[in-house]
Structure formats: C-alpha cells, structure tokens
Amino acid sequence: MSSLLPPAKKIWWNEPIHKSELLWITLVFVWGMVMTFMMPYWHVVGKQNLSNETYRTTPKAFQASAEAFVDQYTVRKEGPRNYPVVAPPAGGDVYMIARLWDWWPIIELKKGETYRFHLSSLDLQHGFSLQPANINIQVLPNYEHVFELTPDRSGEYSVIGNEYCGIGHHLTIGKRFVVE
C-alpha cells in the first residue's frame, strides 16, 4: 500500500525536530501532567465530587431496611399514590429504593444537617440524579451505595432517574424537601 502524497524524504524520522514542534510537544506534555495531578487533587479539595462507599446486599435485605426506615420516620403521605414522606433525624441514615419507574420514599431533610444516604435498586440499573445540585450516581441491584449529604438550601428538589429503565422511564422521579 502506498500513500497518496509520500513524504519528500523517505527517512523522515531522522530529521531534527523543529523548534515550534518541540514547543507544542512540551506544552501538551506539561498540560497533560497538570491535568493528571489536578484530578486527584480536586477530588480531595473540591466539594463537587462524592466520596461514596459501596457494599454487597440483596434486594430483599435492602427492601427490609428501607421499609423499617419508612415505618419508623414517616411524618405524612403525599400525592395520588400516597407516598410516605419520611423525616429522618439529623445525622441519621436515609434509605431510598430505586425500582421500575419509581424512587421511594419522599425524603424531608433539615437544612445544614448531614445525612447518610443508602441507595439500592430492586430490579435494574437506575441513575440517581439530584437536581439542581447535579449529584449523579449509578445505582445497581445487589449493591448498596452510601454517601453523605448536607443540604445547604431549603426548598423542593427532584430526584430524576437518568438511566433508561423501560417504557415508563419518564416516570422515574422522586422528591426531596429541605426545611429550615
């Protein structure tokens, strides 16, 4: 096979590198090194990345934990489907179940308090997206995803399912209330 435009010199790799090429190679290398070290540095220093833990579980065991959590801390029911609104104690654990077309239950948190979230799926892979904070986690069956969250603004927030889970995917929405 031959090139359409063969090089003028057949042995081009023995030619000295031009200064402008050397400058660009150096800039690219230095920038690559800066970015390589900035990623772990910013993970530690920046506040936008979640440091989460993941544990093996079963859907049955996680559902039992979540239902016990809901039974203990439910304060009211909302919506046409009577979803429980759960207000855990400050510093407590929060359990959320992802399942076909549903994030369960609705959570009510206190502003400025830290909570430990436990997420798991009972059926398929789901995406947990807390908006507008833009926190995203892939939630898988047989795994319990745990992270800490401290709400800093009061209001109503949406939990969006951002992983396609079937024909009712557009219904995979949950709520989060943050109160003073």
Where are these regions (language model features)?
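Extracellular/periplasmic metallocenter environments
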Residues: 28-48, 64-65, 137-180
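Residue-level signature for short turns and capping positions that connect secondary-structure elements
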Residues: 101, 133-135, 164
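Generic preference for hydrophobic/aromatic residues in regular secondary structure cores
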Residues: 102-105, 176
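Membrane-embedded segments
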Residues: 106-110, 114-158
